[in-house]
């Protein structure tokens, strides 16, 4: 409640400047009663005409329960404001989050795994440092239109990782981020098409 009051004061102070949204983060670990209560409390909270502009679903979400936990929260929040799922880990988590009602996501995992030579593909991920890629002059993923796949080969990215060149993780990150964005685009198109 105090943050809403302070946000209202700061918003008035910043009159004429772009509006800065305030989002509430729903916690409660794997406990349904805590998650639902936190979601209801934050959804109903208002102070001086201020209310949260959206909600983040945060905390330690166990992978096998991610969809269930997000659905508890989304059932309590309604659909009048966006629901953001914080810190998902793998691309398949996007599907569970969307199915449970999350609208947006963030994650460092595409770059984190890229720094360790993991490359996302439609069939899962692979480690580009494996010896079989030493002389593989195809793109990281055939048909991918990211900068890395259109300019470099598996063999070259493999070489960069083996040589411990910083460019290796940059190129892998570019690909993994592109892959993740295209996956979200495909999910969005699928929802739009029914």
Residues of each region from the PLM?
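Electropositive, surface-exposed helix/loop patches at the edges of structured domains
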Residues: 12-22, 92-93, 142-156
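Glycine-rich phosphate/ribose-binding loops and adjacent secondary-structure elements
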Residues: 17-140
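Non-catalytic, usually N-terminal nucleic-acid engagement modules in DNA/RNA processing proteins
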Residues: 1-15, 131-134
């Amino acid at each position: 409640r105090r943050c809403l009051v302070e946000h209202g004061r700061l918003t008035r102070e910043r009159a004429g400047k772009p509006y800065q949204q305030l989002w509430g983060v729903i916690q409660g670990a794997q406990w349904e009663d805590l998650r639902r209560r936190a979601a209801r409390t934050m959804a109903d909270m208002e102070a001086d005409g201020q209310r949260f502009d959206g909600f983040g679903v945060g905390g330690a979400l166990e992978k096998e329960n991610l969809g269930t936990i997000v659905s508890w929260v989304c059932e309590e929040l309604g659909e009048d404001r966006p629901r953001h799922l914080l810190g998902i880990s793998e691309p398949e988590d996007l599907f569970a989050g969307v199915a449970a009602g999350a609208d947006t996501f963030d994650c460092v995992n595409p770059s984190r795994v890229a720094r360790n030579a993991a490359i996302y593909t439609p069939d899962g991920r692979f480690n580009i440092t494996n010896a079989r890629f030493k002389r593989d002059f195809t793109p990281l993923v055939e048909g991918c239109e990211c900068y890395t796949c259109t300019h470099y080969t598996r063999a070259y990215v493999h070489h960069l990782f083996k040589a411990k060149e910083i460019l290796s993780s940059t190129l892998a990150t570019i690909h993994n981020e592109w892959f993740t964005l295209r996956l979200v685009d495909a999910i969005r198109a699928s929802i739009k098409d029914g």
